[in-house]
């Protein structure tokens, strides 16, 4: 009787296992890629639209275009921004980084209020927003865009004191930018958070173990200690979207000098308007900007 040769069937079986394992890995990778893409859409909600009040507030602002070659995407990028200069040559300059959903015109009212405090203001749209180059935004791409806008400001206003301002999601981008540059005069963050997992945990269903699945983490809490300039964290006392405790937690992780301002009655959207007196006081005390306009 001839012996049964087990080699080829076993080899075929091993090949089958390897094929199944490779297929599973490819499926997981595809699933991770799809999950990452959905998170980017959910977090940024990129749009070329704004609300009616934003359209009116943006009227008269100067259009600017910031071009650069993106190492992250390997493509040429054009960013659209709105520029509000000051007549005084020595005025401080503010880079405004907006949050999710609306394009930069949706933040024009905040930009004007910061302009009324004495700043020259540049607001910029990330890729995928407004008239900037089309792309699905990500944490890495948005930070790259913020760096490009910061370089534009440095070239436009080389002798001015330059500040970084971020609202909501833009606050996390502002923290990351301020942690990586060394020429900012100060960081201002309004209605922001330590990380996306922290925001998710604050929701009603936040007990679900979703943290490990979050790819777009925006870990401002881990980065803010590296910011070497003074830090102002502002939050609305009635912010129901990003809870005040999250702003306080971000503030606690920052290095001195720093200041936390809680605006009574402020929501996620009107804190900047209600908190103008607190802003003026904090800007004078923390940054020494006591010569800002008071008209």
Annotate each predicted stretch with a short phrase:
Residues 238-242, 269:
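Acidic catalytic loop of the alpha/beta-hydrolase fold
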Residues 158-168:
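Alpha/beta-hydrolase fold nucleophile elbow
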């Amino acid at each position: 009787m001839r012996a049964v040769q087990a080699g080829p069937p076993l080899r075929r079986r091993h090949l089958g296992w390897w094929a199944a394992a490779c297929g599973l890995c490819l499926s997981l990778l595809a699933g991770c890629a799809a999950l990452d893409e959905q998170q980017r859409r959910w977090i940024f909600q990129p749009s070329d639209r704004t609300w009616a009040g934003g359209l009116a507030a943006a009227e008269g602002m100067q259009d600017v275009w910031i071009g650069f070659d993106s190492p992250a995407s390997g493509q040429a990028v054009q960013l659209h921004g709105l520029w509000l200069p000051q007549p005084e040559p020595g005025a401080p300059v503010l880079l405004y980084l907006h949050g999710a959903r609306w394009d930069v015109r949706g933040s024009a009212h905040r930009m004007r209020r910061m302009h009324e405090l004495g700043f020259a203001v540049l607001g910029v749209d990330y890729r995928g927003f407004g008239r900037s180059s089309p792309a699905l935004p990500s944490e890495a791409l948005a930070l790259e865009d913020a760096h490009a806008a910061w370089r534009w400001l440095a070239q436009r206003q080389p002798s001015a004191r330059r500040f970084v301002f971020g609202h909501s999601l833009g606050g996390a981008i502002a923290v990351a930018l301020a942690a990586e540059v060394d020429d900012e005069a100060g960081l201002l963050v309004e209605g922001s958070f330590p990380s996306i997992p922290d925001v998710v945990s604050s929701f009603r269903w936040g007990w679900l173990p979703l943290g490990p699945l979050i790819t777009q983490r925006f870990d401002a809490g881990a980065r803010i200690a590296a910011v070497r300039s003074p830090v102002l964290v502002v939050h609305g006392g009635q912010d129901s979207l990003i809870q005040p405790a999250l702003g306080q937690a971000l503030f606690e992780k920052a290095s001195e000098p720093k200041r936390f301002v809680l605006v009574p009655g402020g929501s996620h959207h009107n804190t900047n308007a209600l908190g103008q007196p607190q802003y003026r006081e904090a800007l004078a005390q923390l940054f020494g900007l006591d010569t800002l306009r008071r008209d």
